[in-house]
Amino acid sequence: MRPTVALVVARGVRAMGYRTAAAATKPAAASATSAPATPAKKPAASSYWRKAASAASTASVSNATKKTPVAASSPAAEPIEADDMPQVDTSTVDQAPTFQYPEGAQSNVFQHMNQREIDWEQSFQGLGSQAFSKEAAQVLQAPLTVEDIEITPDGLLYLPEIKYRRVLNAAFGPGGWGLAPRSDTVVTDKIVTREYGLICEGRLVSVARGEQTYFNEDGVPTASEGCKSNAMMRCCKDLGVASELWEPKFIRKFKAQHCEEVWGTHVVNKRKKKLWKLKGETLAYPYQE
């Protein structure tokens, strides 16, 4: 049985469509197989972290600027009147307590504060400017007692150094006087000497040079302290302390009444020597009668 014309035409059209579709797919496949596949580009590390940081900063800014919505149903806060606010006493805020000076002592405090700027090595601040009070003068010029006076084996009368300090403390009070060096310490082969100034109540009252002998180099520090004590004794002469010890008549009278000169024998070399001592006392070592 022969096919009909319509059937033949339909078969031809169908075959033509298959050829057209195959021809269309072949160039695409050929281009895909001819060109190698290129991998997708990854973002650079710097751009990646830049984007991450940008996103984080954007999120933080958005969170910071985000406002919590207020419920529409909550009532609005009423303004507080100034009269209704609690009153706070601010009169004592940031105020340091004021120190009250004792009566008559404020001027002395500021006087001592100003002394920090005075160079006592060269200054003569207050020298002879004003007399001391009557009470201080009576203490300074009080007569000596017989029990306070000592005598050296060579026959020199003296007052122990601690007695001078007690007189100054009684007249001006502890801390009301002091000794200021006015020169460098000079050390010779046998003597240490230095000049000192006596300052009482913030003013210079006397200047004297002290001296002390020594026998070896190890005794220089002790001699320096003795030099200071000797200068204090000489400065106190201007204040009238133990002024009797500088009077020849008093010295002769005291030695005649309370002292005696005896022969002393050295306990080591047995040499004899005339020495002075107080009556009723014995000779000091290394001598004996």
UniProtKB/Swiss-Prot annotation:
Q: Name one GO biological process term.
A: interstrand cross-link repair
Organelle targeting peptide span: 1-20
Is DNA damage given among the entry's keywords?
A: yes
Which controlled-vocabulary keywords does the entry list?
DNA damage, DNA repair, DNA-binding, Mitochondrion, Mitochondrion nucleoid, Transit peptide
Where does the record locate the signal sequence feature? none
Coiled coil regions, renumbered to chain: none
Presence of keyword Transit peptide: yes
Compositionally biased spans, kind Low complexity: 24-79
Per its record, what are the GO molecular function terms? DNA binding; single-stranded DNA binding
Against InterPro entries, the record matches this protein to: Mgm101
Which family, according to UniProt?
Belongs to the MGM101 family.
The name this protein carries in UniProt is Mitochondrial genome maintenance protein MGM101
Classification from the root reads: Eukaryota, Fungi, Dikarya, Ascomycota, Saccharomycotina
